[in-house]
Amino acid sequence: MRLTGASRLGMLCGLACAGHGPALAQTPSPSAQIAAAVLPLPSSLRAGAGVVVLDTRGQPRELRPSANGMVCLADEPGDSTFAVECYPGSFIPLIYRMRQLIAGDMPESVLDQTIEAEARSGRLKLPTSPVASYLMSGPLSAYDWSNNTASDMIVVGHRLYVPYGTAAAMGLPTAQDGIHPYVMASGTYFAHVMIEHHPVRH
């Protein structure tokens, strides 16, 4: 089953790839980037989470090492979107590899085939148990770097990745139905349960 571009990009650039308004004139300080990157996490996980920022080639630069197994991707400067996302370390190799292939302008169908082949061969290690993700995304103008707060124009998302899991096995639908969780990319390396997406709540 080939993945859809919307499904993949929903993870790789947050919940809303296209932001509105001007980009930042300069890159925020590392401490500000770290504070923003861990914001999607439950408060109990923030202090120990590692933070990396990816360059245009999809290569990571560590801003802070992880002390609890969680790794957050900082907002990438230079555009008008605020997007940060956090995953357990076991899922990060897949994130890095997908970002690298996308940065190289690999066609979507070839990317799927490449990831699938690398995962099946064992070259690319995937998690052996479900892993959670925490995301925040929206227009850059809706995030205040000075006090690390987001308005309700920023959307929060929680997902559970279950590589090769199927909707049937989990007893879930494959399309959104009211408030119920549902599965996207069922049966693929990218299979994930969409738990909830909602504007930031204060």
What annotation goes with each model-predicted range?
Residues 1-11:
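Bacterial N-terminal signal peptides that target proteins for export
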Residues 10-19:
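Bacterial N-terminal signal peptides
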Residues 20-25:
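Sec/Tat signal peptide C-region and signal peptidase I cleavage site
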Residues 26-202:
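Primary mode marks residue(s) on the alpha4-beta5-alpha5 output face of response regulator receiver
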